[in-house]
Amino acid sequence: MPLTPTPSTRPSRPTSFSMSGPTTLGVRLTSCSSSLRSSPSSSPDSPTSPTSSTTGSCPKTPPGTPPLPRTSRTARPSSCMMLSCITPQGRSLTSFSSVPSSRRSMPPLSFRLSRASRISRSIRNFTASVSRVLTLSMSRRATQPPTTRSRVRPSTGSRPPVSPLVTSSSPSPFSTLSARSIPSSSSVAALPSFRPKTSLPSAFRTPSPSPLLPPSTRTFVTGWSPARCTTRSSIMSEPSAPFGLPTPPASSGLRSASLSTAGSPLPPGTTFSTSRSRPPPFVPTPRIPFSSRPSLACPTGFAPTLGRSGAWLPPRPLSLPGPLPVPSAGSSPFTPTVSGCSASTSSAGGSGLVSHSMAPSQGSFGRPIQPAARQCSLPTQPLSAKSLLVWQTGVLPPPSGRVCSPRPLRRPGSPTQPWP
């Protein structure tokens, strides 16, 4: 029965054989350091082991002794090992194997140095190309004006400042270094100037793009005072344009100075001085109807009084109440007219006629203020000359018609007192 050797090789270790079959009679292991020539005998009658002829001296171990230990790690590559086994039939099997070197295969130092130099050279070439591209892009960005618009907030001076840092949209990480370039004078004119933040009250703020007021309106706002009941002799100035409407064409230069999107520089004469001139603060005044405030030209007895309930009472007569006398034939009837303001007496000629007519004054912003709602009934009986004289001197008889009592607007917490 032939034996089948099963080789199992491992790196950095000697080659070993495992024999499968019946129990061997003797094992003889021989290791030599030179070339080995073995000639096994094929005759079954030879009781001896296979004859081995070597050119060098090889130590031999008798059968039954344990095998030699493994070769050390410092074994030379030319070492060899011979294993001979004796079978029960007398056949001998000799195997020859060479032990590889136990040293690990490492490349030489020169090869390693050349590989490191090649890697470092490629890294150097890559960094040089990247730096070349970066310097080229920086030089291009420095020569070209920036294309992105930056918001410039104008100061109180005549020229807006120049923004030193312009936002760039380049994906390179070093683009912010090149963005710190001051743009040229041609690109400064293209930057738009936005409206400055003015501290106007809420009543003066308008959604129009021009925050500057025309000259006539600005002088009117400066000299603005709470509205009063005026007589015919006083004249109320009216603004040239309301605040909510766009300004007239005369102020087109001021409007272009506040918001210039075409890219033209500011006119030499226009400055932002109008943003510093603040109008007086808006003080809310009580909305008292003009009819409730009497004129200073009226007599003292003509002024009505304010009752405790808040309603206007008829004026107190200074003479004894009585029926109105019948007017004479030469006297003209008296027809008072109510037009929404306090009456002012004016004598017409020598006839002694009193006309209670007043034109409503304009509001502070060009809007007529609505007078108090009245429903007055005119006197049905005509007045005589004596009654007219009583009216002129201040002695008032009780009126024959219904008393006109408007509803004034009272502020909470203020005491009710009659007008002087």
Curated annotation (Swiss-Prot):
Residue numbers spanned by region Disordered: 1-77, 137-181, 195-219, 235-281, 327-370, 396-420
UniProt feature, compositional bias: Pro residues: 60-69
Keyword set, alphabetical order: Transport, Viral movement protein
Compositional bias of kind Low complexity: 1-18, 30-59, 158-181, 327-348
Compositional bias segments (type: Polar residues): 137-157, 253-263
Gene Ontology biological process terms in this record: transport of virus in host, cell to cell
Keyword presence, Transit peptide: no
Free-text function comment from the UniProt entry: Cell-to-cell movement.
Protein name: Putative movement protein
UniProt organism field: Maize rayado fino virus (isolate Costa Rica/Guapiles) (MRFV)
Species lineage: Viruses, Riboviria, Orthornavirae, Kitrinoviricota, Alsuviricetes
